[in-house]
Amino acid sequence: VADQLVVGDADIRKEYDAHPERFRQAEERRASHILIQADKGAGDAVIKSAREKAEAVLKQIKANPADFAKLAKENSQDPGSTEKGGDLGFFPRGAMVKALEDTAFGLSREGEVSEVIQSDFGFHIIKLTGVKAEVLRPFGEVRNEIAAELKRSEAARKFAELVDGFTNTVYEQ
């Protein structure tokens, strides 16, 4: 049934214009971070020591912001980003631990560095390194997926009609 269906450009455009929220690419942030580990259940002495180390690293960053990546390589305890100078790449909301994400999305300009923040993993220093604003994906980029969706929807409707017709025919006999 679906192979026989043709969806017109006007129908595709109408769907795109009627539901722009479905075709938005969420804002993303690129950040680097330095993690000084102090797991959630760590004792007070471990937490105090980790906070002090994070504060000392932040002081070095404030003295020379260009050293962030170098300081991340030397001090961060995040195995996934340390070798990359703390770079976490671009991420949307919902992809990182809440404290880190809220801080990254709370920074207002590229190059801005946060104060020391705490998460379940320890203490972080976040540097905002990029922002991709929310955008409406271009029609040409989503045209084929809208067409496929409209075809599936129409095929399901036609299939239901055929089943009803078949059921009625069988019932009448």
Describe each model-derived feature in a short phrase.
Residues 113-119:
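Short acidic-hydrophobic surface loop/beta-edge motif
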Residues 96-109:
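Cell-wall glycan
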Residues 1-5, 17-63, 73-99, 125-170:
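Well-structured core secondary-structure elements of compact alpha/beta domains
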Residues 12-15:
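Append "and occasionally in soluble cytosolic enzymes with long acidic Gly/Pro-rich linkers
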Residues 105, 168-173:
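Short terminal targeting/anchoring segments
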